[in-house]
Amino acid sequence: MLTLQQVHYYYHQDLFAFDLEVEAGSIVALMGPSGAGKSTLLALLAGFIAPQSGQMALDGRLLNTLSPAQRPFSMLFQEHNLFAHLTVRDNIALGLHPGLKLTSQQQKQVEQAAKQVGIEAYLDRLPEQLSGGQRQRVALARCFVQPNPIWLLDEPFSALDPVLRDEMLSLVKQLAQERAITVLMVTHHLSDARAIASHFAYIDKGTIAAHGPIASLNEKHSHPELVEFFQAAV
């Protein structure tokens, strides 16, 4: 289980305070107004910023003192962050070794990851030779090839057209279920949350105002701001 206990972070005069428990293997949609703290939560978990107080832990192991590279997270953002001068094969391989010194077994892992996301035919191409959706598949393969139990996704498919976004969401759900990966995904789309999430966390004014099973995310919820958010999104 991933836990955040009284995790406090100050940005200028704004306080972000998070308490959350995430069961292993669940897919959690992080939702809420812009600027509420969704990306801040992911940045704290990833180690890009440090909390002033509180604890973050995975199965009892404290994460606060670990560097970003030591933490058990793979990350995927709206910007695919591919290296333009590297082939698809090498961009995926970076998920296994930053110096691209792969064993034969790791090379097979790269090819398998590419096949699972449907880009095995493009392994020797450069990113500029791919479509936007194909580039995001490369980024997803690099995320998937890493042996981490948790994925942090920050609106990774929001720039894609609706059909392609649905395809990528289905792919994330499929891959996560196959490997029992825990997923925390920031999204502004209620349809995305309903499509793949098992749970949701509604973030408002720097704190987790409501959370629970995705089925409870409806107009009958007891939290008024969440109901307003839900009605605006429908």
From Swiss-Prot:
InterPro entries: AAA+_ATPase (IPR003593), ABC_SmlMolc_Importer (IPR050093), ABC_transporter-like_ATP-bd (IPR003439), ABC_transporter-like_CS (IPR017871), P-loop_NTPase (IPR027417), Thiamine_ABC_ThiQ (IPR005968). PROSITE patterns: ABC_TRANSPORTER_1, ABC_TRANSPORTER_2, THIQ. It comes from the Bacteria. It is a peripheral membrane protein. Its EC number is 7.6.2.15. It holds the Pfam family ABC_tran. ATP binds at G32, P33, S34, G35, A36, G37, K38, S39. It is an enzyme of class 7 (translocase). GO terms for molecular function: ABC-type thiamine transporter activity; ATP binding; ATP hydrolysis activity. The keyword Cytoplasm does not apply. Part of the ABC transporter complex ThiBPQ involved in thiamine import. Responsible for energy coupling to the transport system. Belongs to the ABC transporter superfamily. Thiamine importer (TC 3.A.1.19.1) family. This is Thiamine import ATP-binding protein ThiQ. It comes from Vibrio vulnificus (strain YJ016).
